[in-house]
Amino acid sequence: MRSPSLLLVIVCLLSVSGVSFGQSHPERIRVILDTDANNELDDQHAIAYLLFNGDVFDVEAITVNRTRAGGGVDQHLAEAQRVVRLCGLDTKIPVLLGADKSFEEIRGQLDQGDFDGAEAVNFIIERAQAADDRRLVLLPVGKLTNIALALAKDPSIIPQVRVVWLGSNYPKRGEYNKENDVPSLNYILETEVEFEIATVRYGQPSGTDAVRATLDEIRQIMPGKGPKVSPPVTGRHGGEFSTFGDYSVSLFQNIRLHGDPPSRALFDMAAVAIVKNPDWATAVPMPAPILRDGQWTERPDNPRKIVLWENFDRKAIMADFYDRMQHYQLASPPPEVRRTQP
């Protein structure tokens, strides 16, 4: 029997006052999502949410990188391809191989044609240089290696891109994405690229860690959501799936949950959400700090400014997420970047 209290929560999420699912976007936002897709489960939900907002985003590609969890870079690539397939877009949205190693390990090899991460990095540069009046949003939700490499290889793209990164516990230490490649973050902080940080802040109500879904919510809302694909797709944990919604349930059932009630943060999805609707968080402009010995060092006189995002509206973001799983509008890249993938 379904819990009345849980049903009330779901109803509230789907009808929360002030949420505008159909927010007007005079032009679609060009975006490349950069992901360590096989690390836990928030990446997969970010990919699906992005791809189901085709009226908001022109998704030019999904690029991948390897972080410490989730196996080799090929496994991150396979998971991203799996989710794109489950969204019915595997013949339209490119999924490109990015960096396995770190920024400092690769930077000196950028003049070589086959450097680590070349497919993703060169594509980012190519799309940043495209003849389009809209600036390209780079949305890294893992380590910053691919983004830093693209900026280092061709600094002329800096005015053409906006980088919105999911990462850091700023002003505190730690955080998974940051720790996977600190030099790439410091490199970006020293450039003039437009740079925004969607904070994580483990255990705090002000970061994306507060944007959480419970297993009960997922089990009740997600089954069957999204387009039905054929043939079915084999999941990371086994099983065959024809919709992303069913795969979402599997991901939640096969991961450790935290808190009371047991839940999991959808960090990466929240970063996509605030690019869609900046009203769902608070933007705080600030002088760019730097990381030294694992600590944030403030530079109050630094003329270089960045934006910090905090105080994410969990109810609005989760309501829009669940709505888009039901009322999806599939994304599409510009015709020149579409391609059939195996």
Segments (PLM) and residue ranges:
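N-terminal acidic, glycine/proline-rich low-complexity segments
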Residues: 23-342
